[in-house]
Amino acid sequence: LENYPAPLSPSLQLLDAQDLQASRDRSLLLLGGYLGFGLLVLFLGWVHVRLYGDRVFVAYVSYVACMLGFQVAFTGLGGLFFWPQHWVWNDTAPALFMLWLTASGIWFVREVSALQRHSRTLYRLATFWSLFGFAYPALYFMFLSPAAFKLLNLYGLLSVLLSMGLCIWAWRKGEVHAGWTALGFLPLHLAYPFPALRSAGLLPDSWATQYAVLIGSAIEIPLLLYILHRRAKDFNENSARMRVSDSTDPRTGRP
């Protein structure tokens, strides 16, 4: 068995027909539940876009959409149900959505950390890093070499470190919700090494390498939405207090 450009790390199991069918049923139930939950969170995120008109929610919705696309492609659900006849797309979709997921994640971090207000250098770095992730699939599929695959994995690893670093830096600058966002990312970042090590050929294919990111993201995306909801609510309350203060006579306390 050979796979290109990613190494193949199969694990062998002996199952009878009944056990195989039971395993398939459990997997489909898990994936179906995840997809339905993810679509619900995506809808709620879009409601917040319409409600608050904040760019951070647009970035969040893009991040969740790419996450769902990645999970559908990576777990094989897409090839089984959504595009069974399109084998070329089935082969390219996991890498494409992985890069777009990472790029949209950095875009989301850029917005939630308010980098433009604190450091134009870091703002430009995050912008460039995100744009690179959106554009790199064109180069990756053009060359499709082991070197291009290593660069893809390196981009994913460095993006994990960059996202946490930017959130913690912004938190120390006074962006309280950036610190909470760093904690919200933890479930996914702790799950990331399992598929990454499998892609590098260091771990065999297993339940953990297949579903760790799915479980991590199922915890992460509602946490991030709640953090963003609290952020928007706090900003609105602060804006309301400032409007009242500006319209009040400081000597009499009356409008």
Residue map of PLM features:
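Membrane-proximal, cysteine-centered motifs at transmembrane boundaries in secretory-pathway
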Residues: 1-43, 49-50, 54-57, 75, ...
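Conserved hydrophobic/aromatic pocket- or pore-lining residues that grip, position, or stack substrates
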Residues: 53, 65, 109, 252
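Structural signature of the GPCR N-terminal helical module
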Residues: 59-66
